[in-house]
Amino acid sequence: EILLALKKQGKTLLLSEHRLYYLADIADEFWVMADGEIKGKYTAAEAKAFSAEQRQTLSLRTLDLAEITVPEKEPLPKTAPTALAVSDVRYTYGRKAGDTLSGVSFSVREHEIVGLVGANGCGKTTIGKLIAGLYRPSGGRIMLFGKPQNPKQLQKQVLFILQEAEFQFFTGSVLHELQYGHVVTPEFEAKTEALLKSMDMWDCRDRHPFSLSGGQMQRLTLMMAYLSDKPIVILD
């Protein structure tokens, strides 16, 4: 709605994006970049007519979410142990602000993936930072594997991936970032090399993290999560 409103005002919009579906009926043209160059320009009608093979060749995502299929996976057994339990957790940013979180309770089992969704400002990031021990709750309890945890204990067991990936880099290269905090054995080196290659980042291993594109930075943080020995990972 905001983009349409800007378009009606006569604004010129240039969007740098991977996701195309919400632009299908807004964009006039789609320009495809690769290797630092604009490789092709297509009208909206031409882009909509791309086959799946053409999109894959151009590294484009679908314009129609109905085309996306999600592979089925076996449901977790109901007896799977609880990894994380949040009980009546409350949090406020100040006396005048009122409760940002008011009595939040839920549990997550081991090996379970949960998507926490909601509008901007509803408290998603706040609850994530509480679980990671970055904030101290004003009430309630957070338990990991059946044991109550204080913020310091949570920090040792929960990895929190920020929205702003660059705030989590501390070394001078992609490879050193993945090795940071680990005992670098030959086995770990082989694992890291395989991971970098699987994420199409092997050629970037000696680059400074800040020189990466936004998408590459996000991939680096995901690789850091994969190599982490922390049992709980929160992706903000």
Give the residues covered by each predicted segment.
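H-loop/switch region of ABC-family ATPase nucleotide-binding domains
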Residues: 17-18
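Conserved beta-strand-loop-alpha-helix hinge in the C-terminal portion
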Residues: 37-60
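The feature captures the beta-strand-to-loop junction immediately N-terminal to the Walker
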Residues: 117-119
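Helix-to-loop junction immediately C-terminal to a conserved catalytic motif
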Residues: 132
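Conserved ABC transporter NBD signature motif
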Residues: 140-154
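Conserved ABC ATPase "signature" region
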Residues: 187-204
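Conserved ABC ATPase signature
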Residues: 208-212
